[in-house]
Amino acid sequence: LTITGADHGGGIFASGHADYLEISNNRIVNNYGTYGGGIRIGHPNLINPTVVAANDNQYGGYTNASNDFVRIHHNHIAQNGGGGEAGGGVALCTGSHNYQVSQNAICGNYTQGNGAGIGHLGRSNNGIIANNSVLFNQSFNQGLNVSGGGIYIGGQASLVPTTTPRPSPGTGNVTVSSNLIQGNQAGAGDGGGIRAEFVNGLDVRRTPGNPVPWYQLTVVNNMVVDNMAGMAGGGISLQDTVLANITNNTIANNDSTATAGAAFAPNSPNQSTPQPAGIVSRAHSTLLYNTIGAGSGYKFEFSNPTLLNNIVWHNRSFYWVIDAADPSSFGLWPDVSTNCTSTRCGPPVYRDLAVLGTSNPAHQLSPRYSLLTDLTGYGGANNITGDPLFIFEYTNGDQGQTIQQPELTTSIATAPAFDEGGNFLDVRFGPHSPTGNYHLNAGSPALATGTMQSGVPTTDYDGDTRPISSPDIGADERN
């Protein structure tokens, strides 16, 4: 079945009480929705008027739409558009418990909200996003900082009680497994590949000293490659995510362009501040940090994920500048193109892992048993460095390029609107067709140098079995 041409509710819209709904084997293309362009499950902002404000410690005042056990699989979801909130291709709103989004091709979708490919907004416990191809989706909004080019997982602000602010209801447990997340763009915010925010909140408030019932984000076996963020975290960005397990992923060749409005200091539109590009953790909100119990073992100022067996490689950091000697010349610095002739020429700058916004600039992430571009500046142990020897990798370049090896790069173009405020820069890059192969070649230093412990998946990106000891680092287990 082909569903196309919808102009308000998106291609498929399930409002409420749609337990066990199955959506499969469809072509859902060229639709528009105010909230969610391709497929939308539930409502993003439906308020429950019967809730007693002082007693709602679960949903924060939002209505549970009761769309449990929805299955969305084997669909072609492409070139849909969303007007706001979350989800250009697929939108999952509060009350979509135990959903599964799997084996879909989600490509070329757009949203002015968060999560151009897939958007999980609100509390929907035990969701699974697995084995999808999430390609070339874009989130952008000139007036708002919106995030998550490929996948967005986010809680909402509690509505009640209004007199005493509470943390977000959170998202519920979410697993993101074995997806290809490639070529997506969060042009006005964080997380070109994946953005997770407000995952935890009221769950922590209910048991501040006991983390066992808290919600957890699990990100395993994904290839997060060649994505781009206008702010930080071209690969993955986290905020208010207390429990996160990021294990056996390949996070490579993602870019941060520092072209979002928030990357510019006040009254300084001529040069932005460069941002880290691979995995970024932002400081917790004050409300959540004050809620976390001192005896819980998780009293950190920032999202401090478990980082195990990951390849985090060659994630590039740029910033935007106007040439002082020639104001008509502007663009990204450094210009890494092979035939560069501008004053902005230079080698790529790699910034793979970072913590932003805390009171202590020495705060750092702690990868373990991971392959990194550089071993300095991080906590953790048993990490290695060296070319991972992917079968075929590429880097982002000019929008018109077809395929480029990393050593034959072209420049990434920017399109400014100087008479506008907010996010006044749009970034144009390519290629825009599926390419590359981020499986491991023979001789890779990632082979048999990982560790098998709790939380490590027993199979890889392709479903191949991992050995019980010394698995490969990254999403691929070479067999």
Ranges and model annotations:
Residues 215-443:
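Predominantly extracellular beta-rich ligand-binding scaffolds that present long acidic/polar faces
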Residues 443-452, 470-479:
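Short, surface-exposed, low-complexity cationic segments
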Residues 10-20, 24-25, 441-446:
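Extracellular repeat-rich scaffold modules on cell surfaces
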